[in-house]
Amino acid sequence: SSDEKLARARALGADHLINYRTTPAWGATVQDITGHRGADIILELGGPGTLSQSFEAVRVGGHIALIGVLTGFEGHVPTHLLMSKQARLQGLVVGHRRQQQDYVNALNLQASRPVIDKVFDFAALPDAFRYLQSGAHFGKICVEW
């Protein structure tokens, strides 16, 4: 959502970067980058406000993991693209403790590490929420207590 975030993603090893704010039709850009094959996997954080572009960007038989709903909880699902691309849309939420431990163990097997943007003390919880709502973060916002 900003050139600064794109620069940080590039520093982490990203090959292709698209600012969805300056390129609202980013699904077509993904198609161009991939030679009109589409992306294998899309991590969809925006929710209904960006979901249609995720369907434009995903390849036939691809996977869209809905892991965030920054633009709201309800909205239009482009069923014609879901069906014609035979794509899979999966909603994901943080599960119970065992699932989280399994997830952390799987992450530990990978070379990449989660990016922690900022850590707040529990007493500053309102500040953490304001920071989240600002959209200025790149990576995770953590609260210690």
Regions found by a protein language model. Give the residues of each.
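CheY-like receiver
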Residues: T29, I33, A57, A106, ...
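Glycine-rich phosphate-binding loop and adjacent beta-alpha segment
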Residues: D3, A9, L45-V115, V119-F122, ...
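Adenosine-nucleotide cofactor-binding segment
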Residues: S1-Q53
